[in-house]
Amino acid sequence: MGDKAKGEGMVWGLEAGPGEASLCHTGLEDMLLFFPETLAILSDTGEPQGELTIEVQKGKYKDDLGILTHCLLVHASSRGFLDKSVCGSSLLGYLNEHLELMEQHSQEFIKFPIIPMERKMSVLKQDDQLVVSRSVKEGEETKTGVSVFPCKSLKGFVSSAANVVLLRVMAWRQSVPSGARFLALDSEGKLCYCTYKSLGFQTIQVGNQQAEMFIVEQTIHSEDGIPFSCQFYLLSDGHLAKRVQVGSPGCCIITKMPLIREEDVIEPPPTFDRKPLVWEEDLELYSKFLDRKEQLRLSHTRYLRQHPEAQALVSDFLLFLLLRRPEDVVTFAAEHFGPFAALRSPIPALRSSHQPSPFRSLEEEEEGEEEEEEEEEEEEGEEEGEGKEEVEEVEIEGDDDYLYVDEEEEVEDDIYYDSYYYKYEDENIYEDENIYYDNYDVDNDNDDIDNYDNDDDDDDDVDDDDDVKVDDDNVDVDNDNVDVDNDNI
């Protein structure tokens, strides 16, 4: 029976085998299924006999281990009269999000004057089993029974509590799955199957209003007894407007039309076009702008007054920039302000024509400067070697002797003359005291150079071996105006 029902059934919101869909994906909260409702119990003549109350709400379930879990709490109760005898029923069930039963307790009673009757049933899930406990009391006699079903064989089981929620889901969807077949328990606590069928729509009068109802019929097919069928007239929001038990003269019906709740339609947020802000025309914004502008101006002026060196640095830079007018202003600025950096290495004394980039790292710049110094030393060594081999001689004509000037060597004028006069004043150097010397004029420097002859011969026609060589690159010797008298004694 169970496998057959599971194979043939199709579940809406329950896990009932192939083709099933879990209710957790249907959005119970979006359907607004949590609300109470009350119906009046009427006899076949329309007289009130009692009332039926149904409520579905969120709750918490505490298991045997003391663990609390969220659940759906279904509570229904009725109380009325049957043939002038008090009767009633109650239902309390706990369901998980898949409408699977966790615990359920139901009770029915009829207080007949002679033999009162009471029937109780408890369904409890323990481990992987569903334990059904049933007791029937008729007068003083009580019968009890316990049935155990494995949970793996109860896929698609619809309890009385799950039936209440499932009907509200069908009302929201205004449809019933075709061939909907589920497992259920009959009045004797035995496992059977139930079916749901749509009977279409019908308009009924509720007070002064008319409403269209969606009719669903549930039938419990018991193996030992006749089928038990109920018809449910449902409003579009899930409210139960009428309940009719097939074969019973009475019914349950609402006496007042409830406020039909519709699913909230989330409207997109309004979009507002951005208007251009012309702050110059806004008096408040323009006033704030002027105040802030004046505040910044005073702050800048105060800072420059406290730090005059800043204005001096900028003025110097602009002056050098306008004087040199470089093509690359950024590089020029980096070279100008580079020496002010605290981590910059000192500038070398000798620089090549290839200036290092101011944006290179310090290590690269130091390596480049070392290479440049080595190249400069090599170039100076080569120039000194060439100067010794090739000495450009400037010939100065005289009567008998020549004065050679080496233009490659750099000797300061005052240093040369000091050494010259020092030698001249030393009397031991010269054997001949009667040495006549003349002054000659050298252009640009206005210096007098006296040439002397310290040889032992008396012949003036013989050239002296000791000639004076004057090294000066910046001295221009005029051969036409210089008269050198050698050995005029």
Curated annotation (Swiss-Prot):
Domain of life of the organism encoding this protein: Eukaryota
Biased composition (Acidic residues): 363-412
Main location: nucleus
InterPro entries given in the database record: CATIP_N
Location of the region described as Disordered in the Swiss-Prot/TrEMBL record: 350-412, 438-489
Protein keywords: Cell membrane, Cilium biogenesis/degradation, Cytoplasm, Cytoskeleton, Membrane, Nucleus
Keyword Cytoplasm attributed: yes
Any one GO BP annotation for this protein: actin filament polymerization
Tissue distribution of the protein: Expressed in testis and ovary. Strongly expressed in pachytene spermatocytes and round spermatids compared to spermatogonia and somatic cells. Expressed in Leydig cells (at protein level).
A GO cellular component annotation in the UniProt record: actin cytoskeleton
Coiled coil: none
KW Zinc (keyword) present: no
Pfam families: CATIP_N
Subcellular location: Nucleus; Cytoplasm; Cell membrane; Cytoplasm, Cytoskeleton
Protein family: Belongs to the CATIP family.
Function field: Plays a role in primary ciliogenesis by modulating actin polymerization.
Subunit record text: Interacts with TTC17.
Record protein name field: Ciliogenesis-associated TTC17-interacting protein
Organism, scientific name: Rattus norvegicus
